[in-house]
Amino acid sequence: MATQSFSVAPSVQWTERDATLQTSPSVVVQGATVGKFQWGEVELPVLVTGGETGLVKKFFKPNDSTATDFLVIADFLSYSSMAWVTRVVGPLAKNSVTKGQTAITIKNKLDFETASPSASITWAGRYPGSLGNDIAINVCDSAGFPTWEFRNNFAYAPQSGEFHVVVVDKVGRITDSAGAVGQVDRISVSGTATAAGTISVAGEDIAYLDTDTPATLATKIGAALTALTDVYSSVVVKSNTVIVTHKAIGPQTVTAIVPDDKGLTATAVITTVGASGSIIEKYELMQNTQGSKKSDGANAYFKDVINDTSNWVYTFATALAAGVVELEGGVDDYNINRVAAIQVLNNAEAYDAKPVFAYCEELIEQQALIDLSTERKDTVSFVSPLRDTVVGNRGREMDDVVSWRESLVRDSSYFFMDDNWAYVYDKYNDKMRWIPACGGTAGVWARSIEIAGIYKSPAFHNRGKYNNYNRMAWSASSDERAVLYRNQINSIVTFSNEGIVLYGDKTGLTRPSAFDRINVRGLFIMAEQNIAAIAKYYLGENNDAFTRSLFSNAVRPYIRQLANMGAIYDGKVKCDEDNNTADVIAANQMVAGIWLKPEYSINWVYLDFAAVRPDMEFSEIESGGGIVAAS
């Protein structure tokens, strides 16, 4: 309550109270997952938006080693476009660094801020992985701009003290282009020797005899240039011609030739202009002075701009200088353990999520995933059997899936099991792959939350259809589904005319309870979060009748909304002197009882058909009379 200060003189005093606090049923639908990728922040959750396109932008396209992780997450993102994604690498992973230097490991921005590499490392790949070896950094100053190969990509020429910087894909893997092209020079030898002599080619003095022909001298030149492995990547001799390819990327000075006056001579021309590759990122009018600004007021200090915004490099340089820096030494390590990355997600305030899922190669990773949701109590973890349980295991799928469930040794309403793997197309590598269905099942739940509400079942024919699968590893029969369902395992069933459908909505809770269905668990997750969000505004207030009344009046409309939406049959809030005794008040607590009667989803439909004689009334059969026949 806000008041004016006391006044002795006549005045009007005012007070202000806020009795408008309220809440509405709402839930943020985004997933959380971990996996191995070719690129991206490591051990630091990244919010991917924009579906699969956003996943590629943050973590790059998959290769054979990362495809399963990638496709499981892409599967989820086809239903719900947002997810927290945490990349995992093995202990041997390295970032690429300035050519000729020893590679280091920088997992994320926090690592970079504490890194202190040797002074010889001026640039590094942003993240661990061999993909960083494809990168070069090309810096241009005012003197070199008129002939710079990338000059047409910039609107303004740099002035004295300014630099243009481009990050270049020299291989073509990043930009799906041809990559860098080495300059090719053709050296043509001609003339007739009048005496023994010497010709200088690329700084190498090559002697010839008075009997040597142009073809003979060309062979000698080829042998000399072949030894220059740091200069030329290829040397080919054809008759009196030597064709060389420069090792350095980008345009180069044509091979220098200095003939003598003994009759044999040579000329060099450029037949293929070198190219450094395709631009990934560019930075215009950078400066070396900290605090420098562009004319529009934007930051121009190169270290701040590049290190804060680049998705591909970090710079440790003290100053920019014209030239090309190639990166090397990046190493992939896909020998990972996902458990540590899963535990990073155990921060509900920082990483709001509902479905949690991941491709898991080991049982301990699935257990960690389940434990995460059980501890957070605001998410549901989705798991599928390990691959060999269902893929290529014809006839033993049911038994092995049940054994897998038993080996999980987990009993909680905060996880959800399906029984299948799916066969999907990997468009990035042009091949079919098996992936666990957990990403799709999590996506089906996320889609159901968005279109029907978290308090509705995501399963069966109305909301339980999958989008992306070519076929499933197996489809349990009715009898097999009954066995699986008794073990809290939800089947994914293939119907010839309706497609692939999730056929169950049980959580992993073994005891008979309302919480053994995911719609009830979802309802309580939402209600607990929504009401807790408003309850925090009562911290610091006095535990008196007025405060308790305010709280109750804020929650009652919420309960009515739940009932009107079909989430509950009925509900009640109690926050008064009965449950806020003197002891509770003295302990600086406020206690509220919130009781909800949840709706239940239909899992079985029983249809009772009866043949009725013409002289009978329907009311007679409604009482249950008649003979139950087997045929």
UniProtKB/Swiss-Prot annotation:
Pfam families: Phage_sheath_1C (PF17482)
UniProt signal peptide: none
Keyword Metal-binding belongs to the record: no
Complex and partners: Homomultimer.
Name used for this protein in its record: Tail sheath protein
GO terms classed as biological process: symbiont genome ejection through host cell envelope, contractile tail mechanism
Superkingdom of this protein's organism: Viruses
Family, as annotated: Belongs to the myoviridae tail sheath protein family.
Role noted for this protein: Polymerizes as an extended structure around the baseplate-tail tube complex. During ejection, the sheath shifts to a contracted form, thereby making the inner tail tube protrude through the host cell envelope.
Cell compartments where the protein resides: Virion; Host cytoplasm
UniProt keyword terms in alphabetical order: Host cytoplasm, Viral contractile tail ejection system, Viral genome ejection through host cell envelope, Viral penetration into host cytoplasm, Viral tail protein, Viral tail sheath protein, Virion, Virus entry into host cell
Cellular component GO terms held in the UniProt record: host cell cytoplasm; virus tail, sheath
Coiled coil: none
Major subcellular location class: virion
